[in-house]
From Swiss-Prot:
Annotated 3-phosphoshikimate binding sites: K27, S28, R32, S175, Q177, D326, K353
Superkingdom to which the source organism belongs: Bacteria
EC number: 2.5.1.19
Enzyme class (EC, first level): transferase
Protein name, entry field: 3-phosphoshikimate 1-carboxyvinyltransferase
A GO cellular component entry from the record: cytoplasm
Cleavable signal peptide: none
Length: 439
């Protein structure tokens, strides 16, 4: 990995955390609001959109194809003027997805059915190493043509728009990105499409596509069969993006671990396909209350109040993984402070995220004195050993950066963190919020 261009951030150990915090808008919902707004008729307004690097990459790609999207800044109401279901133009440049796997995978589905138009997608060095065939192969069953390095597995990727046919497609993994790419492609196919997942994954696309007017039905065991009939035009909507539970997870674990902590995380999305982290924290004995439950724009929302107390070790595997895949790094930190052995399995997907998150978390936490081992698809953590301050490195991964920040609060001495600015990918104000909540 290359060295940091910025100075390492100092992370002071000790103290406690008190107060209320509102985490940025949900990243998954932010991407989808921009994408669906761009292919709808009329104007879509988005409240609470995550003003971070990944959704900004999605917006830039859509602007390059003719959608009008107002500038994205913190607190802004975003306006998207859609071009209609088949109005995206062939861009005169390569579409740069930055560091965003969601942008690239959803774009593959969005663009596959743009008959007669040609698109090239690329990204940063990390994204160009992430597997894309898991989207390209199922799309090929609809007639899509995606080419790239490694037989279409790695960007840069070329998409030659085709007239797609409807089909029944089984996805190789329970992945909301794969499913959403197929649903986007199905909107302009000739004939209906049914996507069958091996296990349920987050369902933000289904909820939002229905709200925009798509002819979409969900059925089968545990809602694993999603069917789309093409032809229904999407209409611009007002979308309210709830806070991202994946960002809230850092405060939930910090509040449960740091002695004397008392935190309220406000306006958090509580979609049941995303709340696996709450189930695991409950299993650990964390003191978390859900307050002010409500529904906002078709998504369940609430405020989460957490106070500190002793935690028990945990064990979870592939059955819950789609509901908490992004929270594995911070739960690994939590396990370090539980007396006993915790087991994470079924998490091989984390080896192909922005980094190999299993390897990076093991490497960095061992630097602090943690006792943990990697397995091919997970981690075994023997908790209860005190962690020491250390020279740490996010290795460019936003979730690693924030997880290590929480670990450093509980270390016996101060730490430093290289490439701490990685947090901005999903949580630009994280470091400011941490400073404000510390007492």
């Amino acid at each position: 990995m290359t060295g940091s261009t910025a100075a390492a951030r100092e992370l002071k150990a000790g103290g406690s955390l008190k107060g209320a915090v509102r985490v940025p808008g949900d990243k998954s919902i932010s991407h989808r609001a921009l994408l669906f707004g761009a292919i709808a008729d009329g104007v879509t307004t988005i409240e609470g959109l995550l003003p971070a690097e990944d959704p900004i990459s999605t917006a830039a790609c859509l602007r390059a194809m003719g959608a009008e999207i107002s500038p994205i800044g913190e607190g802004d109401l975003i306006r998207v003027t859609g071009v209609g279901l088949d109005g995206l133009q062939e861009p005169d440049t390569v579409l740069d997805c930055g560091n965003s796997g969601t942008t690239m995978r959803l774009m593959l589905g969005l663009l596959a059915g743009r008959d007669g138009r040609h698109f090239v997608l690329t990204g940063d060095a990390s994204l160009r190493r992430r597997p894309m065939q898991r989207v390209g192969q199922p799309l090929a069953m609809l007639g899509a043509e995606v080419r790239g390095r490694g037989d279409g597995n790695y960007a840069p990727l070329a998409v030659q728009g085709r007239r797609l046919r409807g089909a029944v497609v089984g996805t190789p993994v329970a992945s909301a990105q794969v499913k959403s790419a197929l649903l986007l492609a199905a909107l302009t196919a000739d004939g209906p499409t049914t996507v069958i997942e091996p296990a349920p994954s987050r369902d933000h696309s289904e909820r939002m596509l229905k709200a925009f007017g798509a002819d979409l039905t969900v059925g089968g065991e545990m809602g694993r069969h999603i069917s789309v009939k093409p032809g229904a035009r999407l209409q611009g909507q007002h979308v309210v993006v709830p806070g991202d539970i994946s960002s809230a997870a850092f405060w939930l674990v910090a509040g449960a671990l740091v002695p004397g902590a008392d935190l309220t995380v406000e306006n958090v999305g509580l979609n049941p396909t995303r709340t696996g982290v709450l189930d695991v924290l409950e299993q650990m004995g964390a003191k978390i209350e859900v307050l002010n439950r409500r529904d906002v724009a078709g998504e369940p929302v609430g405020d989460l109040h957490v106070t500190s107390g002793p935690l028990q070790p945990f064990r979870f595997g592939e059955e819950i993984m789609p509901r908490l895949v992004d929270e594995v790094p911070i739960l690994t930190v939590a396990a370090c402070f539980c007396e006993g052995e915790s087991h994470i399995s079924g998490a091989a997907e984390l080896r192909v995220k922005e980094t190999d998150r299993l390897a990076v978390m093991a490497r960095q936490l061992k630097t602090m004195g943690a006792d943990l081992d990697e397995t091919p698809d997970g981690l075994v953590i023997r908790g209860g050993r005190p962690l020491r301050g250390a020279a740490l490195d996010s290795e460019t991964d936003h979730r690693v950066a924030m997880s290590l920040a929480v670990a450093s609060l509980l270390a016996s001495g101060d730490s430093t963190l290289e490439r701490s600015d990685a947090a901005a990918v999903s949580y630009p104000s994280f470091w400011d919020d941490l400073a404000r909540l510390r007492i």
